[in-house]
A protein has these predicted regions:
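Sec-dependent signal peptide recognition
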Residues: 2-11
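Extended C-terminal subregions enriched in glycine
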Residues: 403, 453-455, 488, 497-546
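Noncatalytic scaffold domains of N-terminal-nucleophile
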Residues: 21-50, 54, 62-229, 234-236, ...
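Internal maturation/activation junctions in enzymes
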Residues: 304-412, 421, 545
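Short, small/polar residue-rich loop motifs at catalytic or cofactor-binding pockets
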Residues: 268, 391-394, 458-460
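Active-site rim segments in enzyme catalytic domains, especially the processed small/beta chain
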Residues: 75-82, 86-101, 254-257, 405-469, ...
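C-terminal motif of bacterial Sec signal peptides marking the signal peptidase cleavage site
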Residues: 14-15
Length: 579
């Protein structure tokens, strides 16, 4: 058995109203004929951005371009996401002002049990759990694609999948980031042993090299069937049976069945919006962690001392994270299964009070009690604690089309290469390890406990920000597991308060404050100075030589569209000038 994967992976990864609203939010109607800023796409791989631009040049909607880009990402960046996983898509329709949140999160099989990752009273080792069949949830990406396309798409359904089909058939050059993973994964995981995965990533027993031409006819065939026959070709029949067979295989087989796969439905969830100064942060509701963006921004404002010192602002940002993460970890889960006090958590009166519960720098923050604060009716006794870790096998893309419609989309297979199990040309997710793993059947259960048909909590936080007039201002999002709320909040605060450009906010050192310690990315200026100042203030600082963000953001300025791709990955920005 190959062990110690998680630590090695981290080492490699371094190389509106604040209350919940009905399913849609509406911004003031935009002047479509007045949109003269062109179009833009940014994502984690040039092939994906090229696919998005190709679709936009054909008159496609931002949703069409997002589907095309992500279908390509599943091919060229399989370590991060794909059609064997799921995602969240936040859509802004400029003509109507509507915001729509499409939830393609994976769901637990009907045979899932609350203690399925417990063995003899102990939690199954994370690496074993991660690569097990138990970890596979029903993939939601394809169903989310179709739901979003049916509602927003302009081009025919087969057209949006054609770039990925063409690239899988003709082949593409293996990127350095993908190639760099493979020797380490061979040494410390089962990727080089898993049927299908081994033959694809290690032809002849040797890992693919950067620059190798790689074709995936299985993937092309799967997408061709979905394009021609509809998503039933994925969720019923041979492809679904292949997914179930892979999930039920040894070692540590799972219970996922073809019937579970056939039963999958995407969800259309509420969009939540909250104020930051005179602007509005709009984001995805649970099971995502988008609400943490609203919480961090509000808490940051309350914690500011009035000082112009950037060091004081960073300290306020750290404390805002610490409080928001504690509440997120306690209360967020699947809203279909758990009564999440989201309105209370985002209530301005609660957030104002919560900011007064500032913890000593060396202390571990505990969750607040919004029900007690607002009504004298405690929320704290509802759930057990949960400190679930999430690995960083995720991707994000941001797109604006020529009409000013926008998409912020984050997608994942959870850990790098998911479970490393292969079916029909793609890797299968390990999303079930996003649930609370350590659970007693006899004790109070976390909000994020496993249950049949339940969607695990996610840190993914696709967000769209509007200015004081309700005009589109910013699109942001990132991969990064539990660090996603911190990564995304950095760009929001960086652009809207620290005066940074899109690229400056992305390039700025990442600062993550979940729990007792504060991680600071010291290999990026001024990371070391930030770490030194926080240490002097008494914080328990972990200095990190790199973080695994993959921020792809767009800021709308008077001059045009300011896009940024995270240099920590392989992304680019491309624009189409206005007519």
């Amino acid at each position: 058995m190959k062990r110690n994967l998680l630590g090695s992976l981290f080492a490699l990864l371094m190389a509106c109203s604040p209350a919940q609203q009905p399913a849609d939010q509406t911004q003031p109607q935009a002047d479509i004929e007045g949109w003269n800023k062109g179009a833009i796409a940014t994502a984690a791989n040039p092939h994906a951005v090229d696919a998005a631009i190709e679709i936009l040049q054909k008159g496609g909607h931002a949703v069409d371009a997002a589907i095309a880009a992500h279908a390509v990402l599943g091919l060229v960046e399989p370590q991060s996401s794909g059609i064997g996983g799921g995602g969240f898509m936040l859509v802004y329709e400029s003509e109507s002002g509507n915001l729509v949140f499409h939830d393609g999160r994976e769901v637990a099989p009907s045979g899932a049990t609350v203690d399925m990752f417990m063995v003899d009273g102990e939690v199954l080792g994370f690496v074993d759990a991660w690569q097990s069949g138990k970890a596979i949830g029903v993939p939601g990406a394809i169903a989310m694609y179709k739901a979003a396309h049916d509602e927003h798409g302009h081009l025919p359904w087969p057209d949006v999948l054609e770039p990925a089909i063409r690239l899988a058939t003709e082949g593409f050059e293996v990127s350095p980031r993908l190639a760099n993973y493979l020797p380490m994964m061979a040494a410390q995981s089962r990727l080089d042993e898993a049927p299908g995965s081994a033959e694809y990533f290690y032809p002849g027993g040797n890992p693919l090299q950067a620059g190798d031409l790689l074709k995936n006819p299985e993937y092309a065939n799967t997408l061709t069937r979905v394009a021609n026959e509809g998503i039933e070709a994925f969720y019923r029949g041979e492809i679904a049976e292949a997914i179930a067979e892979a999930a039920q295989a040894e070692p540590n087989p799972g219970s996922l069945t073809a019937e579970d796969i056939a039963a999958y439905k995407p969800a259309r969830r509420p969009v939540i919006c909250g104020p930051f100064r005179d602007m509005s942060i709009c984001t995805s509701s649970p099971p995502s962690s988008g609400g943490a963006q609203i919480m961090i921004a509000a808490l940051y404002d309350h914690l500011l001392t009035g000082s112009d010192s950037q060091a004081d602002k960073v300290a306020a940002f750290v404390d805002a994270q610490r409080l928001a993460y504690a509440d997120r970890d306690e209360y967020f889960g699947d809203p279909d299964e758990v009564d999440i006090p989201l309105d209370d958590l985002l209530n301005p009166d609660y957030l104002r009070y919560r900011a007064t519960e500032r913890f000593e720098p060396g202390a571990t923050p505990t969750p607040g009690d919004p029900g007690q604060v607002l009504r004298g009716d405690s929320s704290a006794a509802l759930f057990g604690s949960d400190t679930t870790e999430e690995a960083a096998g995720t991707t994000h893309l941001s797109i604006i089309d020529g009409d000013g419609n926008a998409v912020s989309m984050t997608a994942t297979v959870e850990a790098p290469f998911g479970t490393q199990r292969w079916a029909a040309g793609f890797l299968l997710n390990n999303e079930m390890t996003d649930f609370a793993l350590e659970v007693s059947v006899d004790e109070e259960r976390p909000a994020n406990a496993v249950a049949p048909g339940r969607r695990p909590r996610s840190s993914m936080s696709p967000s769209i920000i509007f200015d004081s007039k309700g005009d589109l201002l910013m699109i942001t999002g990132s991969p990064g597991g539990n660090s996603i709320p911190a990564y995304v909040a950095k760009t929001i605060v960086g652009v809207l308060d620290w005066g940074m450009s899109a690229q400056e906010s992305v390039d700025h050192p990442n600062i993550i404050a979940r729990g007792e310690s504060v991680r600071v990315e010291v290999n990026v200026e001024p990371g070391q100075a930030i770490a030194d100042d926080l240490k002097a203030r008494g914080y328990n600082v972990q200095e990190r030589n790199g973080e695994n963000s993959g921020l792809h953001i767009i800021v709308v300025t008077e001059e045009g569209l300011d896009g940024a791709a995270d240099k920590r990955r392989e992304g680019i920005v491309r624009t189409i000038p206005p007519n």
